[in-house]
């Protein structure tokens, strides 16, 4: 059995959160009743080190609402693992900035989902979130910490993209744009992007990438943003080739109660086990993840697509959100381009 290396793990340390974001796939707010203890979480951190994980993203909920987060992060860093700390940036204090500096993380990630306070705060569910986030970004950068921003798109904020671009331009902030899935309870399915709206967002990213140099606006589409387009050559990073979704192949997600999935964004029926019952090594090298590393059974358009063997139906989360199954992804630029609108 050929066991791949673990490129990336996204670890939800707690579901507790001080915001109530509309698109949150985990419907974060209150902590899970059975979250890992510090002792259990430290064991998981040791196992990630033993697995030689390249990078671990620590997040919530809101990570700063779990008091032992610095100890867990230090354990990973001491083991040679790159750490990304993802926070909504509304609870940043001088003490936390000092903790982050000592940690030497790869990136501090945060979210901006609107180009002004009114739109951002409506989506994030709490007033003044926008102002606090921008102030925190300034404070983090002033201390030499690298900041990245994610914008999660729904029909509610699609047309905020130009305003967000103006906000981030020239600030040395890496910007990732991604589409919302349907995992949470706060977002209506009617608020999910349609395929053409998804394509519009891609056109916008591609235009930014050809208009502004990377030093001015380093923007990318997340890996859910398109495969095998015949028209959007500037969308992806040069040299980047899509070879199928990494969920369960070279990435995994850990929930705050120890449940493990190939990707943290996938719904609960994709849980493959729990670290309280099996070690991460046993799960990673076991039969369940081995099944994820086999070729994906493709359906519908993807079954006959000339790119299907390499692409395998794109992002698993979006495929499941829009078609209910792996290997059938309506949110595919090649598929959209083959529709009558483009013929």
What does each model-found stretch correspond to?
Residues 41, 198-201, 280:
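Hydrophobic/aromatic residues in well-formed alpha-helices
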Residues 47-60, 329-343:
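Short Fe-S-cluster ligation motifs
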Residues 36, 102-106, 111-113, 118-247, ...:
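Radical SAM enzyme [4Fe-4S]-AdoMet core and its adjacent flexible, acidic
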Residues 173, 223-340:
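Accessory C-terminal segments flanking Radical SAM cores
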Residues 1-107:
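Conserved alpha-helical substructure of the radical SAM core
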